[in-house]
Amino acid sequence: MVRKNALIYFVLIVVLVVASGFSMGMGAVKIPFTDVMIVLAQKIGLFGNHIVPDQFRGVLDIVRIPRVLLGIIVGAALGISGTAIQGIFRNPLAEPGLIGISAGASLMAVIIIVLELSIFASLSNLLGYYLLAFGAFAGAGIAALLVYQISRSDGRSNVATMLLAGIAINALAGALTGLLTYVADDQQLRNITFWMLGSLAGATCETVMAVTPFIIIPVLLLPRMGKALNAFALGEVQASQLGLKVNVIKRNVVVLATMGVGASVAVSGIIGFIGLLVPHIIRLIMGVDNRHVLPASAIFGALMLTLADMVCRTIVAPIELPIGVITALLGTPVFLYILIKDKRKLVL
């Protein structure tokens, strides 16, 4: 089993590296895979004598490399956060959006887009593009905090109440988002629509560096909770009898998932299906041990988003499709197949 898991990790990493290289070469400007590898190798001090056209080098440095790196870290955050949320709620259909994280981020982003000039003018001048990112991140955090506080009773948080609170927050955020969309002008409506459908088009080196710390923390810490999430599969009472601090674990998982998803939504908009689909595929490959499923979900999430981004840039090039549309179109048939194939196992 150890060798099998090690082999799976190795294959996933190799495929991710190769897919990233091909993705950097795809788009309106086609760049040979060998030139991509040479540029990447030169950045670490190798192949110093090889010459790559300046046009290719500029496209890679300014656009493609930051975009692919952002896709990798966002995909990793969405994949591992989805796995952790499913584990803590013991619900194979759960995802971060279920507890209001995505809805809170969306609402705050729409508020900023619609009211930026009238209310957030000074902040917009100070933060520029990052105002939307900070706002979305704050919205995700506020929504998660509300859900967690509503679900607490006598110092404990109830999973069923948390799910119901998440549904309520989603409904409220959806209603307010719809209201703001209704009063938005044409340009604001276009911005809202593009952001709600998700995109990595705005990736820069600064964006990658700004969001990486918020994503690295959950990606590194959530796998350490794999053993505890395995115990949660038996039920909260049984996990408590095994000596686990159930409320502390639930709080930590929700906080870390919120950090990862909130940061991802802040820089890429709403990208669906990664957090829902990735855990199912990894469990089919590696089994249900969260000690292995969590890190593998991060790698596979990065791979899925990298491939989806490559498709959205090339399928109707030079026009670029929203990445959320691609993940939904690719993910829905696979997810339905999994549901039909294993529907007896997925009965809650």
What are these regions (language model features)?
Residues 1-348:
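Alpha-helical transmembrane segments in inner-membrane proteins
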